[in-house]
Regions:
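A conserved acidic beta->alpha catalytic loop
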Residues: 4-13, 28, 51
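Residues lining hydrophobic/aromatic ligand-binding pockets adjacent to catalytic sites
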Residues: 5, 44, 54
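Short aromatic/hydrophobic "clamp" motif used to bind/position activated sugar donors
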Residues: 47
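Alpha-helical transmembrane segments and their immediate juxtamembrane flanks
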Residues: 225-226
Length: 226
């Protein structure tokens, strides 16, 4: 099943070639609401939730076919390998996500510019990985980051400090994050060894954190408290 939010790039033509697919249309308002809409339509006991730019590795496909979950098992999380224009990176800031879970137990909540699944029960890691093959044109990526930065700034300011992770508390300060993220991505995550693709990703994360820092400063300087 696919939830489409108004594709104009030929996506629907590709989907129409596979008679197994069921396509539902819904105007986009938030990632969480879009996912919850999709969940409300799922009739199976388990659901594998994926973005359009996810690709399952062969190892993960084989692993999923052999799963025999117990009654207490509510979900499984997978690690990601990020690709820049098809080139895999050694490490990224993209965390493991719960992608396979019992349909009736799942509910998405908004978190910053993104979303997070809430499950009650055992969630185990999977051995295989998912490739996150993001091929957005640079202009489109930059445009989307403006909206993401505004929502992320609101989340960081509105959430009590004790509920934020250490990383998010640093990000809420504004100025440290843009400087730290470049070195963290290049050195700690090994993107320096990925050549031009690694630098591209590091600069992407730098721009994203600069925009979040600007959004935070804008709110503080204008006296706005969303």
């Amino acid at each position: 099943m696919v939830v489409d939010s108004g594709s104009t790039d030929g996506t629907l033509d590709v989907l129409a070639k596979d008679p197994r697919l069921e396509v539902h249309h819904r105007a986009f308002d938030s990632f969480a609401d879009q996912c919850n809409f999709g969940l409300s339509l799922v009739k199976t006991e388990w659901v594998l939730s994926m973005d359009a730019d996810y690709e399952l590795s062969d190892r993960l496909v084989s692993e999923l076919r052999q799963l025999t979950p117990s009654a207490q098992q509510m979900g499984y999380r997978a690690r990601f390998v990020y690709r820049i224009h098809g080139r895999p990176l050694r490490g990224t800031l993209y965390p493991p996500r719960t992608v396979l879970y019992r349909t009736r137990m799942g509910r998405y909540e908004k978190e910053g510019h993104g979303h997070r699944i809430r499950l009650s029960g055992a969630v185990s890691p999977l051995g295989g990985v998912i490739y996150h093959d993001d091929r957005k044109p640079l202009a489109r990526w930059l445009t989307s980051q403006l909206g993401y930065a505004s929502r992320e700034a609101a989340h960081l300011l509105e959430t009590p400090s004790e509920q934020l992770s250490r990383t998010d508390r640093i990000r809420r300060m504004g100025w440290p994050a843009p400087f730290l993220v470049v070195f963290y991505v290049l050195i700690a995550k090994g993107a320096l060894l990925d050549g031009s693709a690694g630098w591209y990703y590091a600069f992407q994360r730098l721009v994203a954190e600069v925009l979040v820092a600007l959004a935070l400063l804008d709110r503080r300087l204008s006296g706005e408290r969303a």
